[in-house]
Amino acid sequence: LYDIGSGCLLDTSEFDMTHEPTVQESVAAGVDLTFFSCDKLLGGPQAGVILGKKELISRLADHPLARAVRIDKLNLTALASTLIHYVKGEALTQIPIWRMISAPIEELKARVFRWHQSLTASSEIIQGYSTIGGGSLPGQTMPTWLLAIPGNGNKYSAAEIAKRLRRSDYPVIARIESDLSLIHISEP
């Protein structure tokens, strides 16, 4: 039995990150049953997969609890759609987590610059880091460019700015550091 956690299908070391065990490595190693999440680095719906030897999967499917924990049709469709992107070699362009991870640093800077130009509030562009996620690659960070809105240069504190951003018609989540509301522009 092997719980690989994130359900990663791509080699994270190709993106200057710590190597995360992949589903393919587990299967190639002959593990009887591999468990992994469908969200996180896989980029699909929140669900779990048990992958393994046919006779063991059959025994699990026959268990009375199998019906209670099986995936529903909507999540199964979402998972299938996600996996199709991997099969077609489109994961880096079609799956948001991989689009964010693989975005060139220059592209991130250009996005932040566009936001910076459109703001009426005092802001600056600074270098920083982004975390990948708590459940996948814990503690792993990547260099990025951030839009920094200072609390002391505006009418509100950084915490108040972050609160207003979260409650806006198009919510934006900011990280607060040193009285700055930091915004990572990960999607165009």
Question: How would you name each of these model-derived features?
Answer:
Residues 16-19, 53, 68, 72-76, ...:
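Generic structural signal for well-ordered, non-membrane alpha-helical segments
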Residues 118-178:
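Catalytic-core signal marking the mid-to-C-terminal active-site face
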Residues 1-86, 120:
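Conserved PLP-enzyme active-site core in the AAT-like
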